[in-house]
């Protein structure tokens, strides 16, 4: 079984539609994504997944949202 990793991204989101778009693209990756936490107020997206960091980063960028930073926790 692959190890679940925790990634955190600082994503520019101005409304619930923005966070909804990010949530929608990440939800499509289930079951490889086991948990998604999005804070519109803090502009943070936490992803728990077995998928590579760069793959998740590209999926978030495809929503058209600016990703200011990201890291593995």
Curated annotation (Swiss-Prot):
GO biological processes: cellular response to oxidative stress; copper ion transport; intracellular iron ion homeostasis
Signal sequence coordinates: none
Keywords of the record: Chaperone, Copper, Copper transport, Cytoplasm, Ion transport, Metal-binding, Transport
Upregulating conditions: Expression is induced by oxygen. Expression is also induced by the iron-sensing trans-activator AFT1.
Domain of life (superkingdom): Eukaryota
Binding-site residues, Cu(+): 15, 18
InterPro entries hit by this protein: Copper_transport_ATOX1-like, Heavy-metal-associated_CS, HMA_dom, HMA_dom_sf
Assembly and oligomerization: Homodimer. Interacts with CCC2 via the copper anion.
Protein name listed in UniProt: Copper chaperone ATX1
Biological classification of the source: Eukaryota, Fungi, Dikarya, Ascomycota, Saccharomycotina
Gene of this entry: ATX1
């Amino acid at each position: 079984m692959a190890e679940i990793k925790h990634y955190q991204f600082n994503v520019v989101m101005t409304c619930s539609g923005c966070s909804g778009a990010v949530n929608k693209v990440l939800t499509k990756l289930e079951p490889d994504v086991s948990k998604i936490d999005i804070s519109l107020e803090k502009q943070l997206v936490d992803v728990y997944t077995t998928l590579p960091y760069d793959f998740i980063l590209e999926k978030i960028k495809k929503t058209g949202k600016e990703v200011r930073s990201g890291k593995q926790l």
